Amino acid sequence: MTAAQIHSDCSVHMLPRHVKEDVEPIHLLGFNIARKPKWLQFVLLSLAIFILYIGYGYMQELIFKLPGMKPFGWTLTLIQFLIYSGCGYTECIIWHNTKRMIPWRIYGVIAFFTVATMGLSNASVGYLNYPTQVIFKCCKLIPVLIGGILIQGKRYGWIDIGAAMLMSLGIIMFTLADNKVSPNFDSRGYIMICGALLADAVIGNIQEKNMKKYGGSSNEMVLYSYGIGSVFIFAFVVLSGEVFSAIPFFLENSWKTFGYALILSCLGYLGVNVVLTHIKVFGALVAVTVTTLRKALTIILSFMLFSKPFTIEYVYAGSVVMLAIYLNLYSKNKTSWDNMIRRFVARAMGYHDVSVARKDPMTV
């Protein structure tokens, strides 16, 4: 055996060790951020969620401002699902990640709840004041806590439970304010968004549990859940007859309907991927907290960009929800926040030599 053969043979046998030591990739819009510090991963993923979903919220409200669009929320959802599926397949080909890791039966369940979440959410926009829809979605923490207990057997402290109760109070206050000032108050919108909220909470827990159990990627999750979901929605819009009225409407206003839907879907697809990555890296509850903060900003922008009735009671209700969000954030970062509070109090009282337990500032 030649020296070159020996060297080649040794290299082949040593290669798997180096591969095993490689860090599992974490992709953000095509860039691998796995080797970045944990806190920077959190900042980058959270910032991407803010940018993509604020744009998504703007386009969603804009498309439902089109005259006659109100009854076609499910058709819009079908377009979104088809685009998501196509993008997911393209990404799987690009990253050579075509092997399915998660069983079909689980994807069937995830697809059902994904359809319920996005379909009911889109449909509710036609019947609700948009900030009301968003404030309901801000309170997904409530069913996420319940789902975490029932699906994953998690236990939560009294702070998380208190945050959920405050969110419930905020929802009630916002609904009463909406009923007071909205000229076209429609209870169907509330039923739809509550259904979407419950389904969305179930999705987060099922996705987190099975992505960790089977090692499935976010691209795979998007491809199969939205691909199967497209079949479900197509069957629904055909059986309900919605598609036969929607096609002439979409063709008549093709630049706005299909154009807005394309932009909405692209922003949504990128956002879904980032959220799934956030869930895989930091868990469902932390991801919900980040997306909830983003929705609070969306509400402010909605009042600024689109004319709608306003009452100060919206501010009170939103403040209660924001308090609940920060209470939840405190629960997830209790040690580091307690240390910062001790330092602040000590400095305010004139003490400079204060010992506090050191901990990673990015506890999630």
Curated annotation (Swiss-Prot):
It is found in: Golgi apparatus membrane. It holds the Pfam family UAA. The keyword Transport applies. It is a multi-pass membrane protein. GO terms for molecular function: 3'-phosphoadenosine 5'-phosphosulfate transmembrane transporter activity. Keywords: Golgi apparatus, Membrane, Transmembrane, Transmembrane helix, Transport. Belongs to the nucleotide-sugar transporter family. SLC35B subfamily. PANTHER family: ADENOSINE 3'-PHOSPHO 5'-PHOSPHOSULFATE TRANSPORTER 2, SOLUTE CARRIER FAMILY 35 MEMBER B. This is Adenosine 3'-phospho 5'-phosphosulfate transporter 2.
